A protein has these predicted regions:
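Short acidic/His/Gly/Ser-rich catalytic and metal-binding motifs that mark active-site loops
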Residues: 18, 54-59, 128-130, 197-201
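Metal-dependent catalytic neighborhoods of phosphoester/phosphodiester hydrolases
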Residues: 107-115, 246-249
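Short amphipathic alpha-helices and their capping/turn segments at secondary-structure boundaries
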Residues: 33-41, 109-110, 177-189
Length: 256
């Protein structure tokens, strides 16, 4: 995905541009999306589902495709193809956990409608995302998730041994991060959009253009920072193009 950097990192004196204006003097940058597959003795968990292959037509009523084109993505880079490369079928996923229900995280949630996977988001996220008027609200697009049988969590929750969902509102009303405690690699915290990039994390923390509640956002960043300091965790940010290139990514790489 690509977008104006201002969406990710607010700077004074700038305005947000669309892809038709990407050659004007703005920071038009790569905005990677990612999913995380966690394998435990008690089941496989998929964290987020990224963007759909029909992004341009699905997003057309919203105009999101002009601000966040999911271009330069090969067919074999979409979620189902990446899982196939890893030898994992959709019906082998036991839990699909959505950090929040924005279009670039819930875009492939419907892939799992005819499987036995438990579909999970936070209670506050579900309450907002299913009940606003109309088909979309900002980056929430009901076509991605309406009608799915959602189970919800409230508060910080250990969903599997060594896997904790952390409430981190601010970006959305019910945004979550995920903490995974690994025997060899140690603790990893997948912030999702609670923290977009290393530059967002600071300190000091620097907010983004898409923040539902700024006070909650700052509090969530500091909450995550406290957990990192306690656990010496590796932070994996939501959309950090520089960091994603340094991580061990599937299908070749993994963390244990």
């Amino acid at each position: 995905m690509h977008a104006d950097l201002t969406f990710l990192l607010l700077k004074p004196g700038v305005s947000i541009k669309t892809r038709s204006e990407k050659d004007s003097p703005i920071d038009w940058v790569e905005v990677p999306t990612h999913c995380v597959l966690v394998e435990t003795d008690e089941g496989k968990l998929l964290w987020d589902t990224s963007c759909p292959s029909d992004w341009e037509t699905r997003w057309a009523p919203t105009g999101l495709q002009e601000f966040f084109p999911y271009d330069q993505v090969a067919d074999d880079e979409y979620l189902d193809k990446q899982l196939n490369k890893m030898g994992v079928g959709l019906d082998e996923i036991d839990y699909v956990v959505l950090s929040h229900l924005h279009f670039d995280h819930a875009g492939n949630a419907r892939m799992f409608e005819n499987t036995n996977a438990k579909m999970i988001c936070s209670d506050r996220e579900k309450e907002f995302a299913l009940n606003f008027e109309g088909d979309f609200n900002g980056a929430h697009l009901k076509a991605d998730y309406l009608g799915i049988n959602w189970e919800t969590v409230s508060g910080d929750t250990e969903i599997l041994p060594g896997v904790k969902l952390i409430q981190a509102p601010g970006h959305t009303t019910g945004c979550m991060s995920m903490q995974v405690d690994l025997p060899d690699s140690g603790t990893m915290i997948f912030t999702s959009d609670a923290v977009y990039m290393g530059d967002s994390y600071g300190p000091p923390a620097a907010p983004a253009a898409i923040v539902n509640n700024l006070e909650q956002w700052f509090a969530s960043v500091e909450k995550l920072r406290g957990i990192q300091e306690q656990t010496n965790a590796t932070m994996v940010f939501g959309h950090d193009a520089g960091q994603i290139r340094e991580l061990r990514t599937a299908p070749e790489g993994s963390y244990t």
